[in-house]
Curated annotation (Swiss-Prot):
PANTHER family: ACETYL-COENZYME A CARBOXYLASE CARBOXYL TRANSFERASE SUBUNIT ALPHA (PTHR42853), ACETYL-COENZYME A CARBOXYLASE CARBOXYL TRANSFERASE SUBUNIT ALPHA, CHLOROPLASTIC (PTHR42853:SF3)
Gene responsible for this protein: accA
GO MF annotation terms: acetyl-CoA carboxylase activity; ATP binding; carboxyl- or carbamoyltransferase activity
Protein name: Acetyl-coenzyme A carboxylase carboxyl transferase subunit alpha
Subunit structure: Acetyl-CoA carboxylase is a heterohexamer composed of biotin carboxyl carrier protein (AccB), biotin carboxylase (AccC) and two subunits each of ACCase subunit alpha (AccA) and ACCase subunit beta (AccD).
Record organism: Sulfurimonas denitrificans (strain ATCC 33889 / DSM 1251) (Thiomicrospira denitrificans (strain ATCC 33889 / DSM 1251))
Biological role stated in the UniProt entry: Component of the acetyl coenzyme A carboxylase (ACC) complex. First, biotin carboxylase catalyzes the carboxylation of biotin on its carrier protein (BCCP) and then the CO(2) group is transferred by the carboxyltransferase to acetyl-CoA to form malonyl-CoA.
UniProt cross-references to InterPro entries, sorted A to Z: Acetyl_CoA_COase_a_su, ClpP/crotonase-like_dom_sf, COA_CT_C
Pathway(s) where this gene product acts: Lipid metabolism; malonyl-CoA biosynthesis; malonyl-CoA from acetyl-CoA: step 1/1
Predominant location category: cytoplasm
Gene3D superfamilies named among the record's database cross-references: 2-enoyl-CoA Hydratase, Chain A, domain 1
GO BP terms, alphabetized: fatty acid biosynthetic process; malonyl-CoA biosynthetic process
Keywords recorded for this protein, A-Z: ATP-binding, Cytoplasm, Fatty acid biosynthesis, Fatty acid metabolism, Lipid biosynthesis, Lipid metabolism, Nucleotide-binding, Transferase
UniProt key word Metal-binding: no
Amino acid sequence: MATYLDFEQKIKIIQEDIISAQVRHDDGLVASLKKNLDKEVSKIFTNLSPFQQLQLARHVDRPYALDYINLLMRDKYEIHGDRHFRDDAAILCYIGYIGEEKVVVIGEQKGRGTKNKIKRNFGMPHPEGYRKALRAAKLAEKFNLPLLMLVDTPGAYPGIGAEERNQSEAIARNLLELSQLNTQSISVVIGEGGSGGALAIGVADRFAMMRYSVFSVISPEGCSAILWNDPAKVESATNAMKITSGDLKELNLIDDIIAEPLIGAHRDRDSAAAAIGEYFLSELKKLRQMSNEQRMEERYKKLTSVGAFSE
């Protein structure tokens, strides 16, 4: 059963009317209602607030990394474990094919349903997850395979065990190694990009965001609690933080915005996956036209140009 957000209620009513008309075989009414639906979708989704985009990024039905991996990849083989401590289920690593390209894919996975959410730790990786990701990235480098990273996490896990196993070092190590990785790399924020947990697989030649994804140094809830001592002011915090794909593109913090379906990736997973696949393959083609030195130099300039200052 589809889940509708508060601002999608008119869409829900029209879609229910369409189903009712289809049951009655009233083709004329179905056609009319579908036109009304297209108009309502355009009206709502072309005027979304940052807070509404945050709700879409966190939508319970939004495709996760594993959904995209299953839709995009074939002949795939999963890579397990960091060879130091354990296998972290919050990070997925696969080698396989996207189209005719042999690739390595790394993704952060939130999980669906209570048992799976617990297994995936709600998409919050431990240090061993980031070390597994680095192991997969190094395999891509060793065999000269392109790397695709799918970012979707509220943040790195802040528990005692994670800190004892040096969470900050694992993230910092990934930032260093991925910035110097000698193969083509593309990172895409598919849902939530939360702080260092997102950055740990976000350093790449190309960094893109899905239309309704978000990327921030802290959650809006955390920001509102710190600034106003009131978690209820999350909407104000969201508006002020500039966390949407449009804001971040304007600030030159990302390279591209991937046009997921206007109504949201959760309503049309196949089209959303196809958009990621097309973006990956087209950007990979561009990266391969560069010399290795040119590509590494461009990556370095991009990473060192992040931020702004005034004297």
